Amino acid sequence: MSDINATRLPIWGIGCNPSVGDEVTALLASGEA
C-alpha cells in the first residue's frame, strides 16, 4: 500500500500546475494506449 501512496502523492502535487498536469495526463494516456 505504501508504494501506491508514494506514486499517487507526487501526482497530486504535480496536478497543482495545470501545464505540468497536462503533460502528466498526456504521458499517462499514451502509456495506457
From Swiss-Prot:
The keyword Cell cycle does not apply. Processed by the macrocyclase-peptidase enzyme POPB to yield a toxic cyclic decapeptide. POPB first removes 10 residues from the N-terminus. Conformational trapping of the remaining peptide forces the enzyme to release this intermediate rather than proceed to macrocyclization. The enzyme rebinds the remaining peptide in a different conformation and catalyzes macrocyclization of the N-terminal 8 residues. Residues 1-10, 19-33 form a propeptide. InterPro entries: Amanitin/phalloidin (IPR027582). The modification (3R,4S)-4-hydroxyisoleucine is found at residue 11. There is a cross-link at residues 12-16 (2'-cysteinyl-6'-hydroxytryptophan sulfoxide (Trp-Cys)). The modification 4-hydroxyproline is found at residue 18. Keywords: Hydroxylation, Thioether bond, Toxin. There is a cross-link at residues 11-18 (Cyclopeptide (Ile-Pro)). GO terms for molecular function: toxin activity. Belongs to the MSDIN fungal toxin family. Major toxin belonging to the bicyclic octapeptides amatoxins that acts by binding non-competitively to RNA polymerase II and greatly slowing the elongation of transcripts from target promoters. This is Alpha-amanitin proprotein. It comes from Amanita rimosa. The lineage of its organism: Eukaryota, Fungi, Dikarya, Basidiomycota, Agaricomycotina.
